[in-house]
Amino acid sequence: MTSAAAIPTVILNDDNTMPVIGLGVGELSDAEAEQSVLAALEAGYRLIDTAAAYGNEAAVGRAIAKSGVPRGELFVTTKLATDDLGFQSSQDALRASLERLGLDYVDLYLIHWPAGSQGTYVDSWGGLMKLKELGLTRSIGVSNFHAQHLDDIIGLSFFTPAVNQIELHPLLNQAELRAVNAEHGIVTEAYSPLGVGSLLSNPAVTAIADAQDRTPAQVLIRWSLQLGNVVISRSSSPERIKSNLDVFDFELTADQMAALDGLDEGTRFRPDPETYTGS
């Protein structure tokens, strides 16, 4: 089993460090989120990813408190909901998130979606810059931002996000956006790495899993890690949570990586950031 000390980290463009693998709690109930976070922290995870829009920040906070893991060992991410976009409202929203989480600061605060007008998410970015200055978040970043969205906030603020969290799996490998992120020194963080489960039975994935004597989920997570991404996966099963962390003692071959790269067809299981207006 992988221990917390054995999980590699990446240095962000603001010199903070971030574990390369974590647990996400999107779409989990309070009870599921609390159980999953407790199981993850016990298994060795230290990156926990939630969001105001998930409605389970308080449950995540309870699990963190119950775990006994020192705050300094954790990397906690939450996200700004679309309803709270704006310079001042983004600041008020993080303070409310911190109260629900029972924390004095988060390690990473993300704009969840580039919804609304350009001015709205650019103003929100200014709010996040202020929150970083105040020490309420150590790092700031974005989620679901495309190249033009990134150009907007960087060009108008002269401050580059540390992280861009995006849907990413072999059916949507995001090669162009990953390259844009890299050009800016932005870490790509992959969510939905299993294609919301649809890839677990894909013949190319299962063939590699058989060859490596690994689970399909481990193969998919390992593929994303070898691309240089930070990866967050979601599960409410303690057994799968443990298994999904056990990905640091094997490597996919160049041919296996190429086979998974070749599955790309632009398939999204989550909303398209170009058209999404929700939270």
Swiss-Prot record:
Entry keyword set: NADP, Oxidoreductase
Domain of life of the native organism: Bacteria
Binding residues annotated for NADPH, in chain numbering: L194, V196, I232, R234, S235, R240, S243, N244, R270
Any Pfam family hit: Aldo_ket_red
Listed InterPro entries: AKR (IPR020471), Aldo/ket_reductase_CS (IPR018170), NADP_OxRdtase_dom (IPR023210), NADP_OxRdtase_dom_sf (IPR036812)
Keyword NADP annotated: yes
Active site per the UniProt annotation: Y54
Top-level EC class as recorded in UniProt: oxidoreductase
Keyword DNA repair included in the entry's annotation: no
Molecular function, one GO term: aldo-keto reductase (NADPH) activity
EC number, as in UniProt: 1.1.1.-
Family matches, as PANTHER family: 2,5-DIKETO-D-GLUCONIC ACID REDUCTASE, NADP-DEPENDENT OXIDOREDUCTASE DOMAIN-CONTAINING PROTEIN
Stated family: Belongs to the aldo/keto reductase family.
Protein name, as recorded: Aldo-keto reductase Mvan_2161
Organism the protein comes from: Mycolicibacterium vanbaalenii (strain DSM 7251 / JCM 13017 / BCRC 16820 / KCTC 9966 / NRRL B-24157 / PYR-1)
